[in-house]
UniProtKB/Swiss-Prot annotation:
Protein name per the record: Protoheme IX farnesyltransferase
Record's keyword terms, sorted: Cell membrane, Heme biosynthesis, Membrane, Transferase, Transmembrane, Transmembrane helix
Designated gene of the protein: ctaB
Localization, UniProt: Cell membrane
Bilayer topology term: Multi-pass membrane protein
Source organism per UniProt: Sulfurisphaera tokodaii (strain DSM 16993 / JCM 10545 / NBRC 100140 / 7) (Sulfolobus tokodaii)
Family membership noted in the UniProt record: Belongs to the UbiA prenyltransferase family. Protoheme IX farnesyltransferase subfamily.
InterPro entries from the UniProt entry: Protohaem_IX_farnesylTrfase, UbiA_prenyltransferase, UbiA_sf
Residues that span the membrane, as ranges: 30-50, 55-75, 106-126, 127-147, 152-172, 177-197, 233-253, 281-301
EC code: 2.5.1.141
Reaction(s) this enzyme catalyzes, per UniProt: heme b + (2E,6E)-farnesyl diphosphate + H2O = Fe(II)-heme o + diphosphate
Length: 301
């Protein structure tokens, strides 16, 4: 009995460590922002007359299903990029790099997460499941396998993976895809390049060592900073345009935070250093979070 207890305890420890490794690879912070996008889409799509049970099931389906599929895609990405991650200080801690999660294991677990997440999406409706699967497909196949190793357009086109989260949320509550849901998803698409180019400019040497053709690797710092500023400037009108649907409070908040984001973008352009790029990167996620949270709050009150 004692040996059995020890064995069970060791198995539990081993499984818990594996679970922690999978969570690390799934990038919880990224998933939390995608979930926020899904919630914003869900709230925007809520009909005037709702069935409480149906809405709760649909909400849980898109959040749980979307989180699993997104996490699965990132776990597969970890398996795909072991060699590149070894060359980058920023990613050298990942369980796939340390050998704690093997390549085939990452592919298997990630695929299971995506399939299960998509199936859960069907509890809302088929359109929700479609967008959940689409987000994972864009991230794994279009971005990670096809574009990321080949072109600086990788993160631009790959931004549609984030858009799919918002579209899935809207579909879960409304069962439809409309101009409003498109605009919300397109806002996330437009936000993506400035966010990740700022990160790539901060860790330019890392990306260069890994031979990943991010824009800041292929151009000088000033050109990269200019691209970030232009990208953010092009995004802002879409953030404000949603104000036509969301009302005055949202418009005021989005104007204030957008002005601050543009201020930081101009600062980066005038002084394109790693520190300024890091400030731009660290601001961009809270910017999007504030936009989405404001949208959620004003539509619920």
């Amino acid at each position: 009995m004692k040996i059995t207890r020890i064995y069970v305890r060791l198995m539990a420890i081993s499984l818990s460590r594996k679970l922690i490794d999978y969570i690390k690879l799934s990038k919880p912070r990224v998933i939390s922002l995608l979930d926020l996008a899904a919630i914003a889409g869900f709230v925007l799509g809520l009909p005037k007359a709702i069935n409480i049970t149906s809405i709760i099931v649909s909400f849980l389906a898109v959040i749980i299903g979307g989180s699993l599929a997104s996490g699965g895609g990132m776990i597969i990405n970890g398996g795909l990029e072991i060699e590149k991650d070894k060359k980058m200080k920023r990613t050298s801690w990942r369980p796939t790099v340390k050998g704690e999660v093997g390549r085939k294991e990452a592919y298997a677990i990630g695929s299971i997460f995506i399939v299960v997440g998509t199936l859960i999406g069907f509890l809302a409706n088929p359109l929700t499941a479609l967008f959940i699967a689409l987000g994972a497909f864009i991230y794994v196949v279009i971005y990670s396998i096809w574009l990321k190793p080949r072109t600086w357009w990788n993160i631009v086109i790959g931004g549609f993976a984030g858009s799919a989260a918002a579209w899935a949320g809207f579909a879960a509550s409304s069962g439809s895809f409309t101009l409003l849901s498109f605009l919300l998803g397109f806002l996330i698409f437009m936000w993506t390049p400035g966010h990740f180019w700022s990160l790539a400019l901060r860790f330019r040497d890392d990306y260069k060592n890994a031979e990943i053709p991010m824009l800041p690797v292929l151009t000088d710092e000033r050109t990269s900073a200019k691209a970030i500023a232009i990208s953010n400037a092009l995004m802002v009108p879409f953030a404000l345009l949603i104000g036509l649907y969301a009302g005055l409070i949202y418009l005021i908040v989005s104007t204030i935070v957008s002005a601050f984001l543009l201020y930081v973008s101009v600062k980066l352009y005038l002084n394109p250093t790693a520190d300024e790029a890091w400030e731009s990167f660290k601001l961009s996620s809270p910017y999007l979070a504030i936009i989405l949270l404001t949208l959620i709050i004003v539509k619920l009150i």
